[in-house]
Amino acid sequence: VGPQSGVTNETVRPAWYALRGGGWRDWVTLLHPPYTLWHLSYVAVGAGLAPHFHLDRLLWALAAFFLAMGVAAHAFDELHGRPLHTHIPSSALAVAAFVALGGAAGIGIAAASAWGWWLLVFVAAGAVLVPAYNLELFGGRLHNDWGFALAWGAFPALTGWFVEAQTIRFEALAVAAYAAALSLAQRTLSTPVRRARRAEGTLAGTETIERTLRWLTWASVMLAVAVVAARLR
């Protein structure tokens, strides 16, 4: 299928949320804003459903995941093949990735010293998952649908729960399964869109899927807002 009439490979942006290339816009696009918010919502839902809730712990967890997932993971991803076609220098991407990942790990270590040393298990797991998934280390064995669902769905939700509860119960596994299942749905929808935009240079067949992804983003974020708001009452 070729590009739509009047649309060329040069005018098809690599993602529905991508800004026009160049300068600060490349950095905004790099963050994948809708999807970063979507996956941060899993942290909030996990924390909000835990038996004990501390707003400060949630905020620190969100900060750590924003650095690790929103910045580091996406910077590594752009280093590995330039899927967003940004003009950000590779050196700047590498610095952003390692500084952000180090910042996230620092938050995690400080949190573990204050709230419980078992958090270090999650810190270590995150420090491995971010480069392993996005740089396709270990032969790319983690870079698949289930790797995405577990790393960017189940893991944030389970971490959000553990930050608050310092233990794992059935409910924690259930919320992790929710996040993994929704992430699989996201991946199923976004894969053909990425292929159309980035490999084929066409928007044909993307409109309905992308509209669905937009609404799912809003739904995920609003669920997180509702859960946290209920705990703050």
Q: Across the structure, where does each feature detected by a protein language model lie?
A:
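Hydrophobic alpha-helical transmembrane segments
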Residues: 6-86, 92-130, 150-233
